[in-house]
């Protein structure tokens, strides 16, 4: 990202390096390419400034008067960008070069009751649920609303005092079914919110994957239900020996974190078919998240677009035309 401190630090020392080889995952969108390619060629191909790159290859897409929420490529821009960077870039998929097992992706749908759905819909429409002083659940902007709705889809939500208010157990019921159908085979369960983890631990004999001992125990089959947060599932974390099934109890808008966690099991050395289960609450933001992941959309834009219409187009622009290589 052009806004990341890592990018700014690399930009300063890049002229000192005679040769640079960059390794990266799949960019979220074409806009993300500017920073990555810029570090390699110091702005020769896509321009020295993100504003110039944006003006050259993109048009405003979703906007509210002067505030631009997202951009779309100009006609022919995608092909032109790929042409410009083709001499210094190569795309390689592990499945094309390594002996990889089959990977199956499933959607496990759950439904809330009428009263639970009504509560969710009221939060989506009014951005607040009133329970009394210090107990209200409210959202001040699109990002906060998306966060609250995702929590409710999972089954619980924090109020304004930080207390957890339980909504339903639909996903936990579905997880129990998956555990039973696994017949003793280990499951790696991904969660996002702390209350997700707490509710899982309260109901199942699960264990966190945090330390080297946790990793070793998982890989020798000592942990039947392992909990992991996507942000902690970094590159180099090898879990493929301990199991081949992932359950996304809580989805993530981050395509990078999603792919990174799945790659802990779906990687070289995995001997079994990898099954990725996505628990999705029907009629909720879960469906928007899964769609965004499936089309490899820019996560921030997808999140804002999914809820923006409900709150009159409020969003933070937060962009600058002055960031350059």
Language-model-detected regions and their locations in the chain:
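PAPS/PAP-binding and catalytic site of the sulfotransferase fold
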Residues: 29-41, 80-84, 121, 200
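Non-catalytic, charged low-complexity extensions flanking SF2 helicase motor domains
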Residues: 273-275, 279-325
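Conserved RecA-like ASCE P-loop NTPase motor core of nucleic-acid helicases/translocases
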Residues: 186-193
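Short, well-ordered alpha-helix to beta-strand connector turns
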Residues: 14-18, 37, 223, 242-243
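Conserved helicase ATPase motor motifs in RecA-like P-loop NTPase domains
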Residues: 17-30, 38
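Inter-lobe coupling linker of SF2 helicases/translocases
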Residues: 5-18, 25, 45-184, 276, ...
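Conserved RecA-like P-loop NTPase helicase motor core
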Residues: 197, 205-296
């Amino acid at each position: 990202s052009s806004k990341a401190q890592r990018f700014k630090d690399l930009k300063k020392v890049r002229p000192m390096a005679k040769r640079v080889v960059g390794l990266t995952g799949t960019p979220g969108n074409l806009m993300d390419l500017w920073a990555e390619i810029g570090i390699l060629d110091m702005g020769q191909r896509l321009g020295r400034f993100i504003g110039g790159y944006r003006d050259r290859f993109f048009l405003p897409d979703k906007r509210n008067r002067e505030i631009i929420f997202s951009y779309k490529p100009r006609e022919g821009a995608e092909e032109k960008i790929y042409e410009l960077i083709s001499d210094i870039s190569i795309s390689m998929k592990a499945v094309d070069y390594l002996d990889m097992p089959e990977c199956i992706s499933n959607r496990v749908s759950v439904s809330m009751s009428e009263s639970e759905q009504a509560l969710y819909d009221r939060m989506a429409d009014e951005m607040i649920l009133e329970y009394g002083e210090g107990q209200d659940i409210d959202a001040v902007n699109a990002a906060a609303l998306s966060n609250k709705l995702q929590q409710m889809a999972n089954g619980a939500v924090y109020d304004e005092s930080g207390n957890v208010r339980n909504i339903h157990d639909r996903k936990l019921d579905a997880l129990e079914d998956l555990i039973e159908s696994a017949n003793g085979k280990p499951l790696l369960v991904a969660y996002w919110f702390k209350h997700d983890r707490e509710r899982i631990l309260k109901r199942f004999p699960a264990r966190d994957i945090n330390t080297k001992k946790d990793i070793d125990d998982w890989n020798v089959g000592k942990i039947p239900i392992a909990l992991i947060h996507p942000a902690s599932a970094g590159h180099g974390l090898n879990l493929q020996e301990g199991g081949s099934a992932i359950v996304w109890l809580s989805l993530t808008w981050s395509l990078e974190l999603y792919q990174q966690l799945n790659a802990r099991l779906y990687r070289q050395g995995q001997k079994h078919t990898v099954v990725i289960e996505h628990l999705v609450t029907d009629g909720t933001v879960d469906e928007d998240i899964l769609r965004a992941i499936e089309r490899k959309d820019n996560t921030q834009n997808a999140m804002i677009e999914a809820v923006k219409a409900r709150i009159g187009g409020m969003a933070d622009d937060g962009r600058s035309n002055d960031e350059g290589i």
